[in-house]
């Protein structure tokens, strides 16, 4: 979604990213669909294709959503469709979530972050990832490799998704270890490895028996999802130098979980340490539980106090339904310009919503909040607000690693990479 507090450069960043569909001719929209927009203008009809679930850098997902309904007249240069990470033609990489700056049972020690299960259940920080798996078929000295669904000595449930050609079907749900492409590589077996009946055939009839080795493409550990695209690329004259290639694209849906990394826009990043039930999160005086709990010790030593201003101004903007576009270094206008703006907006929000606790003159910007487990108020007033928080690409699913045994360094006895 759009940020409540921004810099004013979000629209330019979205335009320069190249993910928006921008109209090149003025006219009227006749038809809008998920994959195309048809536009009529100057006596011509133009079809503008939209990108659907395409793999992007870092295995993320690119998708365009139409913004303007059919029947509307548009001008040249207007935005027709939002792309990846844009909302209404502006950069929209994160969400405005309710945050409290306070310690909580040590779970936000060393920049760790405590989050509410609402972010999981309501898919606030759920992302789509597309992974590409590929396999090639070569012509070996024993003969060409074959793509087939008839693989001997394999359990039937591993082959359940293959079609008659030996390739996984579109729309199949695949889990770790499932076979995506069935492939057999011919190889000559040693005399001793033949079965007795094969040896008899060779001795009596002189029939050469060749064995095949199973070289299937299997889904690696940690991979699971839905097959959204299959591409079989065949080049003319299949030889060793231009083999056939099969690409399988798998879409994965990842909710936010313990070990993922989140960050604000002030370098205030952290790892999620625990996901709490909604009823256990600290809650405000109007009964709303907070979504995230950040450590207040991450602010003074790093001197990125802008996050506190953003947090409080976001709270006012969320209640007043306003968006603010503030350039950095606005202290040049007058002394303490940021503080004056934030406090005046908080005061206005407390007046309009008839909630005096939003702006308390004794501790402006802070509020008394309650422990969700006991219902008792915390000792000190706490800064609460709606900053813009992003989920980063550093996800625990890509980083988790383990090994049972392997090579060690002689001196330090540490495992080698």
UniProtKB/Swiss-Prot annotation:
Disulfide bonds: none
InterPro entries attached to this UniProt entry: DNA-dir_RNA_pol_su2 (IPR015712), DNA-dir_RNAP_su2_dom (IPR007120), DNA-dir_RNAP_su2_hyb_sf (IPR037033), RNA_pol_bsu_CS (IPR007121)
GO molecular function per UniProt: DNA binding; DNA-directed RNA polymerase activity; ribonucleoside binding
GO biological process: DNA-templated transcription
Keywords: Chloroplast, DNA-directed RNA polymerase, Nucleotidyltransferase, Plastid, Transcription, Transferase
Reaction equation(s) it catalyzes: RNA(n) + a ribonucleoside 5'-triphosphate = RNA(n+1) + diphosphate
EC number(s) reported in the record: 2.7.7.6
Subunit structure: In plastids the minimal PEP RNA polymerase catalytic core is composed of four subunits: alpha, beta, beta', and beta''. When a (nuclear-encoded) sigma factor is associated with the core the holoenzyme is formed, which can initiate transcription.
Name under which the protein is recorded: DNA-directed RNA polymerase subunit beta
UniProt organism field: Saponaria officinalis (Common soapwort)
């Amino acid at each position: 979604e759009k940020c409540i507090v921004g810099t004013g450069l979000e629209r330019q960043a979205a335009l320069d990213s190249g993910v928006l569909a921008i109209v090149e001719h003025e006219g009227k929209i006749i038809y809008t669909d998920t994959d195309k927009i048809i536009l009529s203008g100057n006596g011509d009809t133009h079809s503008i294709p939209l990108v659907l679930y395409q793999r992007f850098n870092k295995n993320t997902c690119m998708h365009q959503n139409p913004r303007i309904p059919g029947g509307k007249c548009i001008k040249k240069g207007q935005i027709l469709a939002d792309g990846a990470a844009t909302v209404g033609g502006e950069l929209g990489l994160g969400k405005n979530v309710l945050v409290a700056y306070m310690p909580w049972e040590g779970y936000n020690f060393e920049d760790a972050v405590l989050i509410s299960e609402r972010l999981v259940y309501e898919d606030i920080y759920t992302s789509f990832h597309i992974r590409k798996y590929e396999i090639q078929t070569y012509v070996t000295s024993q003969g060409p490799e074959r793509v087939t669904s008839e693989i001997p000595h394999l359990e039937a449930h591993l082959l359940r998704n293959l079609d008659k050609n030996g390739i996984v079907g579109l729309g199949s749900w695949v889990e770790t270890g499932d076979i995506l492409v069935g492939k057999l590589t011919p190889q000559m077996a040693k005399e001793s490895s033949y079965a007795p009946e094969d040896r008899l055939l060779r001795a009596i009839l002189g029939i050469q028996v060749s064995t095949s080795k199973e070289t299937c493409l299997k889904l690696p550990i940690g991979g699971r999802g839905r097959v959204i695209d299959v591409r079989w690329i065949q080049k003319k004259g299949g030889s060793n130098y231009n083999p056939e290639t099969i690409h399988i694209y798998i879409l994965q849906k990842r909710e936010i979980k313990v070990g993922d990394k989140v960050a604000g826009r002030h370098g205030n990043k952290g790892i999620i340490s625990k996901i709490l039930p909604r009823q256990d999160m600290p809650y405000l005086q109007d009964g709303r539980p907070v979504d995230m709990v950040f450590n207040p010790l991450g602010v003074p030593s790093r001197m990125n106090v802008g996050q506190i201003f953003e947090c409080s101004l976001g709270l006012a903007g969320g209640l007043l339904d306003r968006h603010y576009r503030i350039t950095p270094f606005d202290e040049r206008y007058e002394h303490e310009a940021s503080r004056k703006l934030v406090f005046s907006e908080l005061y206005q929000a407390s007046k309009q919503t008839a909630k005096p606790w939003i702006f308390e003159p004794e501790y402006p910007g802070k509020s008394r909040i309650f422990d969700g487990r006991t219902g008792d108020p915390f000792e000190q007033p706490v800064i609460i607000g709606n900053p813009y928080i992003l989920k980063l690409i550093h996800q625990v699913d890509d980083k988790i690693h383990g090994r049972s045994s392997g090579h060690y360094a002689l001196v330090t006895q540490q495992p080698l990479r």
